[in-house]
Each structure stands twice: as structure tokens, then as C-alpha cells.
Amino acid sequence: MISLPSFFPARPASLAGRAVFLALLLAFAAPAFADGPVHELYPEAPDASPLPSAGRRLGRRAPRVAIIIDDIGFDAALAEAFLSLEIPLTFSLLPHAPHRLDLARRAADAGVEIMLHLPMEPLEYPRVSPGPEALLSSQSGDRMAERLSAALSRLPQVRGVNNHMGSRLTGLPAPIHRVLSVLRERDLYFVDSVTRPGSVCRAVARRLQIPFADRDVFLDHDLRPAAIDRQIEMLIRTARAYGQAVGIGHPHAVTRDALEKARPRLMEQVQLVPASRIVQTAG
């Protein structure tokens, strides 16, 4: 295995800076990128931004990786297959999923952290629907807060929230401020799934001082086993460079099998933790 170059800089705060870093990683593990309307993945493409200058380096603590599995709650058997991996995943459940309550209980019993996968308006709406009871830019702040509170009430075990779709809403400061204000009142964290460039979530989270993280790597936008394996390697390299990283996958059998295959590598090279161990409150 080629080792990670020692000159990689401190973790970029901006999406543009992270895109440049990912471009460097692609020299070692280049995946095929694809968008899709089901999960609304923002492709991890490079841009022309300059490489960020080096900053604070992390100590000898093992790099931490959180792996979030989105869209949990529809296929109970497949969710159980992920639980059988016996690694500290984080399940993000859709609020309207038919098996959400049972799977949330099973996951909690297995030590798997629970998040709410909150449907938000994509740029393609209404041609592409984020699902029932989604947060939409046409709604008032009070209406969005009501829908968010209702969704949270359906999953009392949740520790945090990430967005399902949301490429339109996550670019709008006022709606995101209202959403994150509700999370602050409930002592919940937020992970931006990063389904668009120019998301305002990090800036609003910093203003509100709520625990926050960005998604670094989508594991399965390309469902070929070799492509998923490359994305897992990218996740490991990102964590080794910056001390921690967040990966998001989806409930596919091929994703589960790839994680099983990568389990020894993950356990040896990084510390797998729930998402709550990754999120930080920006100073």
C-alpha cells in the first residue's frame, strides 16, 4: 500500500478545500463518480482552489472514523445484516420508514447509534421528492419546526440528525438556522450530508454553537464492489490525514459485504466510533 504523503495540510474547513484534498487522494484511489436522484449525492470532484496552508497537526491519537448508514427502516433483514458486522456504525433512519421503531430498538441494543435522516427539499423538487413530511423552502419557519419536532418524536432514541437530499434547503441560511435552532434546544448534533456545493450548514452551526460535522466520503455512489473498496480506502486516508472522517453508505448488500471485507483493515488503521464522537462545536 502506498503511504499517505506527509505534506497533507490540516483539515480544510471549506467544501472547496476538501474537494482539492479529495482530488489528491484520487491519485491513489480514483473512483467513478455518479449522481443519482435516490440519494442525491454531490460528486466529490476537484476544483481550482489553492491547497490550504498547513495548520495544527493532531497528536498520536488513533484517527477516528464514523460510518453512517442512511435510509435505514425499509429493509429490516438488510439492516440486521449490517448489525451483524458488530462494528460501531451509526444508523440514520427515515422518519416515515415502516420498520423504524423496531430497528431503532434493535440498533440501540446492539450499541449502534441512531440518527434521524431528515427529508429536505432538493433542487429538483417537485420532480424529485424527498419523501413524506419533508422540509420545504416554501414553508414558514414555524411549519418547518413543527415537522422536525414531529419527525423527532417518531424516533426518541436519536442522538443527531443528517439531511436526506436537501440540496436546495441546505443552501438557504434562514431555514437551516431554524432547523439547527430546534436541534440546539434538544441537545442534538447535525451532520451535513453535503449534497450540494455552497452549503450553509457549517456556518450556521458555528453561529449557533451546535455539534457539527460534514460528510467526507460517500461509500457507495458507485455500487461496484471495487469502487466501494476504493471509497473505504479514501475514508481511511482522510482520517489518517486529518485525525477523523465521516463516511456515508446506504443499505445495500454490496455495501455491507464491502464493510465486512474491510473490517480488519478498518480496525487496524482507525478507531471506528459513532457519529457523536466525531462532531465538534466550532470555536
Predicted segments, located by residue:
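N-terminal signal peptide c-region/cleavage motif recognized by signal peptidases
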Residues: 29-30
